[in-house]
A protein has these predicted regions:
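PLD/PLD-like phosphodiesterase catalytic module centered on the HKD motif
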Residues: 1-221, 225, 229, 339
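Conserved RecA-like ASCE P-loop NTPase motor core of nucleic-acid helicases/translocases
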Residues: 52, 256, 265-272
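Hydrophobic residues on the short alpha-helix immediately C-terminal to a glycine-rich phosphate/catalytic loop
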Residues: 65, 231, 255-262, 349
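Conserved two-lobed SF2 helicase motor
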Residues: 303-319
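SF2 helicase catalytic motif II
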Residues: 312, 323-354
């Protein structure tokens, strides 16, 4: 499955222009930390974030503003924790995938000291400001969760601002490890979803239900994000084929739909009609298009952008020829349940579409 982008929904249903230095969450949207952070990111020349954990739901909310900040030349540093595995690998992959190496992303790396700070620092041309309080980066913590956060500047309280900022710099430069590709793979491989993470996810889901009855905006989630990053890296290295092996429930069909979004002509091959129909619905949701058709016993559609084909039909010699499809017609091909490819018809399809 996939999920919707709550930040976009919030912007649609409630445009906030209210400014406050004390943010407490709850039912009053004016008290959401998210709105104040978003406004600060939009103006900042550089951004420093230190939180004990990152969750995918919160990262998704801030990605748009952070991306725009990078495009105008802002510097971004993020220091987070890896204790107890509360930081989700998908949140880190999302930052790396969407924002690239422009963000200096690090883990706190002292094993004998706890790490529970939550602070957001923004530096402008003439001054700096600092948010400090209880909110890590999760959807509920940025919106309706009961969180207490306070904002002040280096003009209103220069002494304490310098204490906090200098401590951040020391932790970032002297007590951290860079989250490069190798470190991220290691963290992801050893990661097990902690029990407390389930509670945090539940809060996010409840917050999501309260926000809107909007039409879902489908986005990758969890292991899908990690897989998409791996597929993109594989293509960057010159590979033209990839095998995705994932547990039941990951949402492999949605994953294929997300990965196909930048390709004009897509072929999805499966051995059962039920799978083809379900896949068509998933691709329709992700690509937001009705430009798809079926190639099976009842239909021989050849003119749509996305074709869902039965292996029993397409795999016949009668149809694997230029009267139906040129060998290079499709720019993206998905073979569902590839372990069936030992079947002669599957192999014929794979060999034909080079």
């Amino acid at each position: 499955m996939a999920e919707r982008n709550t930040a976009e929904e919030l912007d649609d249903v409630y445009e906030i222009k209210y400014s406050t230095d004390a943010m407490t969450g709850g039912a009053d949207k004016r008290m959401y930390l998210y709105y104040q952070l978003a406004n600060s990111i939009k103006k900042a020349d550089s951004v420093d974030i230190i939180v004990s954990f990152l969750m995918e739901s919160g990262v998704k909310m801030l990605l748009g503003e952070l991306d725009n900040a990078l495009k105008r030349g802002a510097k971004i540093r993020i220091l987070t924790g890896n204790y107890l595995g509360i930081t989700q690998p998908s949140a880190l992959y999302l930052i790396k995938h969407k924002l690239g190496e422009q963000v200096d992303l690090r883990f706190y790396n002292e094993k004998n000291r706890s790490f529970h700070p939550k602070s957001y620092m923004f530096h402008y041309k003439d001054y700096s400001e600092l948010y400090i309080g209880s909110s890590n980066i999760s959807r509920s913590a940025l919106t309706s969760g009961i969180e207490w956060n306070y904002r002040f500047s280096n003009k209103t309280d220069p002494i304490n601002y310098e204490k906090f900022y200098n401590t951040f710099v020391d932790l970032f430069e002297n007590h951290s490890i860079v989250i490069d590709d190798e470190e991220l793979k290691k963290y992801s491989k050893n990661w097990h979803r902690p029990a407390v993470s389930k509670d945090l996810d539940r809060y996010d889901l409840q917050d999501d239900k309260e926000i809107s009855n909007q039409i879902p905006l489908f986005e990758p989630r969890g292991a899908q994000i990690e897989a998409l990053c791996a597929l993109e890296n594989t293509r960057a290295e010159g590979a033209r084929r990839a095998l995705v092996q994932a547990a039941t429930g990951v949402g492999k069909t949605y994953l294929a739909a997300f990965d196909s979004k930048n390709y004009e002509r897509v072929l999805f091959v499966a051995h059962r009609e039920e799978i083809l129909k379900q896949a068509a619905e998933s691709f329709k949701n992700v690509r937001d298009s009705d430009d798809y058709g079926f190639f099976n016993g009842d239909s021989k559609c050849t003119e749509k952008s996305v074709i869902f084909a039965s292996v029993a039909t397409l795999g016949r010699v009668d149809y694997l020829n230029e009267n139906y499809f040129e060998p290079d017609y499709f720019t993206y091909v998905v073979i569902d349940e590839f372990h069936h490819a030992v079947n002669e018809q599957y192999q014929r399809i794979v060999d034909y579409f080079k």
